[in-house]
Amino acid sequence: MSDNKTSLSYKDAGVDIDAGNALVDRIKGVVKRTRRPEVMGGIGGFGALCELPTKYKQPVLVSGTDGVGTKLRLALDLNKHDTIGIDLVAMCVNDLIVQGGEPLFFLDYYATGKLDIDVAAQVVTGIGEGCIQAGCALIGGETAEMPGMYEGEDYDVAGFCVGVVEKEDIINGTKVAAGDALIAVGSSGPHSNGYSLIRKILEVSNADLTEELNGRTIADHLIEPTKIYIKSALKMIAEHDIHAISHITGGGFWENIPRVLPEGTKAVVDGKSWEWPAIFNWLQEKGNVDTYEMYRTFNCGVGLIVALPKEQAEQAVALLNAEGENAWVIGKVAAAEQGEEQVEIR
């Protein structure tokens, strides 16, 4: 072999192992702040260990995985990365609470073409904040530097969460019946859904993201992190007979509410029971979006819809509002004919 040939390294190929190690050192404090007593060991191992909480008699594991979609593009364009991790945690843990699950631990996957330690640390710090809000431990993750797969320093994130629920307390919608009340729990904005349409609206309307709407810029409204409902929802579940919970995500009202309704029932939603947050009216006007399409794409100000006996609705609303949520009675469950749509907005 010729001596004058250059010796190549992994770094020459675009993968900086030292940068990855530096990132791990930066985020150790974040991970420590999320720790739960069930977690065994620290980060850096091949796998993470977590015991089941001893308070459960027949524990059932609940799992979920999600991303934040094209809201990431907005974060990249705004160079604002400190809250996208909250979105990531929220999209996973809010799916767990639908079945009554208490989140136990969370793992993240961060992939990029070229690792920017500062940006990645901001993202993971946001993930840690989301885990604190949800009461779960950030126990591990993967940072993948993949030159040629992503443009420049663009990145993508995915999250994985595991929770636990008592077997006899699983919420699965089978108890939903005509006459149940429907409670809405307000959202913080578009959350992490509908951003491909949002970006199209911004493009065709040539919108100014620095424009102010109700004292905040359009950019601030759109990048607002997804609300995490875990602590207030767990308290509600503990004190009330919850029949179903729907997380209003991609597909809006039309797609998500029927997922928790048994055959022969429908949700009758009072469209006059709340005012859409201003950002949704702005999006509808700028994009000339039909109202049906708005309800099919966005949460329109509603993050969760809860079904429960009507005699418990008033107390549940009061509990949620005392916990800092914005909750109200949004409608009821009614009998549905065969083939009838399961969501009716009046």
Curated annotation (Swiss-Prot):
The molecular function terms of the Gene Ontology recorded here are: ATP binding; phosphoribosylamine-glycine ligase activity; phosphoribosylformylglycinamidine cyclo-ligase activity
**Family indicated by similarity:** Belongs to the AIR synthase family.
What is any Pfam family matched here? AIRS
* Coiled coil (residue ranges): none
Give the pathway. Purine metabolism; IMP biosynthesis via de novo pathway; 5-amino-1-(5-phospho-D-ribosyl)imidazole from N(2)-formyl-N(1)-(5-phospho-D-ribosyl)glycinamide: step 2/2
Q: Which GO terms describe its cellular component?
A: cytosol
Q: Which reaction does it catalyse?
A: 2-formamido-N(1)-(5-O-phospho-beta-D-ribosyl)acetamidine + ATP = 5-amino-1-(5-phospho-beta-D-ribosyl)imidazole + ADP + phosphate + H(+)
Cite a single GO BP annotation. Answer: adenine biosynthetic process
Q: Which SUPFAM superfamilies match?
A: PurM C-terminal domain-like, PurM N-terminal domain-like
Keywords noted in UniProt: ATP-binding, Cytoplasm, Ligase, Nucleotide-binding, Purine biosynthesis
Class of the enzyme per the UniProt entry, highest EC level: ligase
Organism equals Aliivibrio salmonicida (strain LFI1238)
Which InterPro entries does this chain map to? Answer: PurM-like_C_dom, PurM-like_C_sf, PurM-like_N, PurM-like_N_sf, PurM_cligase
Name it: Phosphoribosylformylglycinamidine cyclo-ligase
Taxonomic lineage from the root: Bacteria, Pseudomonadati, Pseudomonadota, Gammaproteobacteria, Vibrionales
